[in-house]
């Protein structure tokens, strides 16, 4: 059962909007269309429509988020793998995600949507707003157990690991002993990632040249999950400076001021709502395999000459290009904290997304599944 990361599965939307931000934007659609990932929606001008549709609006009273008026977003294909194999339904290579891993399983005799399934979710939100997802996830694991006659192997990537940990922490040990055989964690950001501060301050176009970082920033800020991924104090020193400007330094003790200074105070509320969700870092209570990339330059801190609207100078440290090594190594602490085995495997030179299709990863999964 595959659990994707942030941005890691398709989202669909249907519109019936009172107003639009640009005359080129659709106001009403008869059916659902692909909101993520559809490269055509990210072109100049059209991207304004996309941002207005995919953003979330934070409600300070209910502490939850809602879509803009007249936008209905759904997650296609729960229980299936298509929406995480290719993020772009046209199967363009740019959106290839879980495909290589799933196809390898199929080559070994597994069947898509039968004994290999996907658990996509609305990755814009944190687990506190995705309660129905966890109910469905539990039911699906039980169903897979019944249909296939044995416990399930979970494979999660990136933020999907935070979701998986949250889920496992809420199941009884008896349930986990019965239904979960192994848990493979790929590129898990257990302690948050330094890159998040840049995403919130000035945006990050993920190296997609047609997109301006400042444009996409509003969408990235509005996703609760971005704020959930800020570095945590159980991983990083309290005095580490993540962001510096000519007039201020920001450590993880300065988030409230950081949000005020970037003029996004809702973010501080979102962070407070989500910080406790896996803060205890309770071990998962199942046999675990932590695979993590090293040896790739990973953003570690940022210097802004003009804060926050200009791109920063980036300082790097070790990791997989996204997840800093110290965040990935949380797994080590669990080795002596649970009776089930915790195995760590360093993937040297493995980038955050590429590790999913890396030969080492795939052969590790194969050995695990076939007890080789």
Give the ranges of each region predicted by the language model.
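N-terminal non-catalytic accessory region
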Residues: 1-155, 159-220, 239, 244, ...
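Short, surface-exposed loop/helix-turn segments at secondary-structure junctions
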Residues: 301-317
């Amino acid at each position: 059962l595959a659990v994707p990361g942030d941005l890691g599965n398709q989202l669909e939307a249907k519109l019936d909007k009172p107003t639009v931000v640009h005359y080129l934007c659709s106001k009403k659609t008869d059916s659902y269309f692909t909101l993520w990932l559809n490269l055509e929606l990210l072109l100049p001008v059209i991207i304004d429509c996309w941002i207005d549709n995919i953003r979330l609006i934070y409600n300070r009273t209910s502490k939850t988020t809602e879509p803009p008026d007249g936008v209905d977003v759904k997650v296609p294909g729960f229980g299936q793998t298509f929406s995480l194999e290719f993020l772009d339904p046209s199967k363009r290579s740019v959106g290839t995600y879980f495909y290589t891993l799933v196809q390898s399983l199929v080559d070994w005799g597994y069947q898509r949507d039968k004994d290999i399934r996907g658990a996509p979710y609305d990755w814009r939100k944190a687990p506190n707003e995705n309660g129905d997802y966890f109910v469905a996830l539990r039911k699906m694991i039980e169903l897979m157990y019944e249909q296939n006659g044995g416990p399930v192997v979970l494979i999660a990537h990136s933020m999907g690991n935070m979701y998986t940990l949250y889920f496992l922490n809420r199941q009884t040990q008896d349930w986990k002993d019965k239904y979960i055989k192994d848990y493979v964690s790929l590129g898990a950001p257990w302690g948050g990632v330094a890159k998040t501060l840049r995403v919130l301050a000035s945006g990050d176009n993920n190296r997609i040249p047609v997109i301006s970082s400042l444009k996409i920033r509003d969408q990235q800020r509005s996703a609760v999950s971005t704020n959930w991924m800020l570095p945590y104090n159980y991983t990083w020193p309290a005095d580490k400076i993540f962001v510096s400007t000519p007039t201020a330094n920001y450590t993880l003790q300065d988030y409230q001021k950081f949000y005020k200074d970037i003029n996004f105070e809702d973010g501080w509320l979102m962070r407070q709502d989500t910080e406790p969700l896996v803060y205890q870092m309770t071990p998962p209570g199942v046999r675990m395999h932590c695979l993590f990339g090293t040896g790739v330059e990973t953003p570690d801190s940022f210097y802004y000459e003009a804060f926050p609207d200009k791109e920063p100078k980036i300082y790097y440290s070790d990791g997989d290009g996204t997840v800093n090594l110290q965040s990935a190594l949380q797994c080590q602490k669990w080795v002596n904290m649970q009776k089930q085995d915790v195995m760590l495997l360093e993937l040297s030179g493995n980038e955050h997304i590429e590790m999913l299709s890396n030969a080492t990863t795939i052969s590790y999964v194969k050995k695990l599944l076939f007890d080789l």
